[in-house]
Amino acid sequence: MLDGHRLQELRKQVSGDCTLRFITTQDTAGYDTYRRSVCFLFIKAVHDVIGHECPQQVRVRIHFSLGAGFYCTVEGIDHVGMEFQWKVEERMYELVQQRLPITKELIHTEEAVELFHRYGMFDKERLFRYRRSSHVNLYAMNEFRDYYYGYMMPDTGDLKYFALYLYQGGIVLQMPLKDEPEKVPLFVPKDKLFRVLSESVRWGDQQGIDTVGALNDMITQDDMREIVLVQEAFQERKIGEIAKQIA
């Protein structure tokens, strides 16, 4: 909701007279909140499906937008196939039916670093080692906690519009478009766009800068010049490949 001109979560108590306007998925802020919350639901469901025996060996990566959804991979398991997709999707719907509260918790930054290490979220563990603030807000769904840069839905009950599709060794988390919030469009493969975006991801992986935390490490080690030189080499090679195709 908007408290005057400030965006606030629904759990926020109003302390005095003000003008309120409720935000929906027709608003950009509301639409982003819905998509962010569904991503949290997806990651929680993946962790529930794989169990708690080996969380540090499994890494859920939400890579990039692809049409109305996000392309995601789950690293550290034998195979991302139809059975795994079905189990995750079923678990997501179960969590929706349970209307689990999505709560915000203020914890010490050092505690957050330890938490992300236990979950195997080493990218966020690295990121928070650079955080100057002594405390951080995390969102929780039952015992599972994670960090997000924006507001969340108050509970899982309204996160019922989504679909999962197997694609290129990963999963597309498909969600409604902004102008049709109660309809999940069919996933239409975008192979050319996928190849370009995947190549960008590979470039980051090859340089060891697949996350912001990793990039911070490189900056503190004074390796920015090397990063720029390698990126320029990648670009020159790509331009050469395009020239060959034209010729």
Positions of PLM-derived features:
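Short acidic beta-strand-loop surface patches of small beta-rich interaction domains
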Residues: 1-10
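Auxiliary tRNA-acceptor-end handling modules of aminoacyl-tRNA synthetases
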Residues: 12-33, 45, 53-66, 71-246
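TRNA-recognition modules of translation machinery and tRNA-sensing kinases, especially anticodon-binding
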Residues: 37
